[in-house]
């Protein structure tokens, strides 16, 4: 009778081990994926900081070039594009300064618009993080809308070097 019972239990240990290993592996992969998500959050924070910093010292017409600069691109998370990073110039009230048609304005009008800029904001727009297939039940098909990230800094030179009497190269616009 004892032999009969023992023969029915052969292989049970390997089945239990397989189930436990499977559960542990799913847990480890889930923890790694959540860690990758949190790392992407930090990368986006750093990306907006770098982009805002560059925008404070680059000329206003370079605002569409900043998201493609190497300093910013190196911090892109997976599936991020330059269109997801928006650079905006703000007046003293925090309202966006409209720069459309800036190059077609007269020098006086350009100076007037330029003088309104007090802050620079870099923000993430419409970026969705994609989880790997293991966590694809999170969000919509594994896509999760990222929280709003933005960095606002006071405007500095905005790419314009002030003229000095002892330097012939000063008073020019520096292209980033």
Explain the meaning of each model-derived region.
Residues 54-176:
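Short, conserved structural patches
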Residues 2-73:
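Alpha-helical assembly-interface signal, strongest on the long, hydrophobic N-terminal helix that forms
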């Amino acid at each position: 009778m004892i032999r009969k019972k023992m023969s029915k239990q052969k292989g049970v240990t390997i089945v239990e081990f397989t189930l436990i290993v499977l559960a542990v592996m799913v847990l480890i992969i889930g923890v790694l994926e959540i860690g990758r998500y949190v790392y992407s959050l930090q990368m986006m924070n750093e990306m907006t900081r770098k982009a805002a910093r560059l925008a404070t010292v680059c000329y206003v017409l370079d605002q569409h070039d900043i998201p493609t600069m190497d300093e910013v691109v190196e911090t892109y998370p997976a599936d991020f594009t330059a269109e997801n990073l928006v650079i905006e110039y703000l007046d003293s009230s925090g309202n966006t300064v409209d720069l459309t048609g800036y190059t077609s304005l007269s020098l006086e009008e350009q100076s007037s618009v330029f003088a309104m800029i007090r802050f620079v904001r870099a923000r993430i727009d419409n970026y969705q993080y994609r989880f790997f297939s293991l966590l694809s039940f999170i969000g919509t098909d594994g896509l999760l809308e990222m929280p709003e990230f933005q960095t606002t800094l006071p405007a500095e030179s905005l790419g314009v070097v002030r003229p000095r009497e002892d330097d012939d190269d000063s008073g020019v616009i520096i292209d980033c």
